[in-house]
């Protein structure tokens, strides 16, 4: 009950914020957690949060360990019941003196102070942790201690409400029409889900695919402002670190894809539950076998 209430209390205005945190326990993680870092040996690390000392603290989970780890009171503490972050976001460099706009809250102190999701390199690892804006300090769970840091990356929202038919400033095109017109990643509520699709500013149209059709959307859209790498896949494959763009009617995640079709590079979705990928094109929901999936970019380890 505590964790369910927390989702409602801390969720942002994003279309899919209620899906961002999923319950977990020692020995098992949700099916599609969002990778946020790694151990020195390359093992991925994920963002965790748990009720702790009358607050909700943010930490890390290593899938090879039993439980998650929370930094609090100078100590790295293990917890057996927790939630794992399964949403999206962009990592922005920051310091303890300046929190960037759109920072994602993930927890709170006992006095209600919000805690924000951060990560930082430490002894060859990239470790998720928390930032307290009152103390102006970041904290990581590492080596049995609560490690204090002053320089880190903050997770910020990478979906923003779309006003009109122009992409937000500074957003790069992710695809193109056969005539070369750029296409941008958007998403919109459809049925009981939220579906990724495409925006064509040249003709002022926004489309998602749903129920066998290409559906033109005129309201309620969000634009993707993040970035990543495109990884080739086919036949229902989902590469590690795939970025979720929404969810289907049954709650299954939908990943952001693009595929070559009719001379263009079109944007769409991939549903791992059905093993199928689709793009909206020519009034139809077109199934594609070969596609590229947008995944998080971690850069070099060090």
Identify what each model region corresponds to.
Residues 10-21:
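N-terminal signal peptide
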Residues 1-6:
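Classical eukaryotic N-terminal signal peptides for Sec-dependent ER targeting/secretion
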Residues 19-302:
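A structural motif
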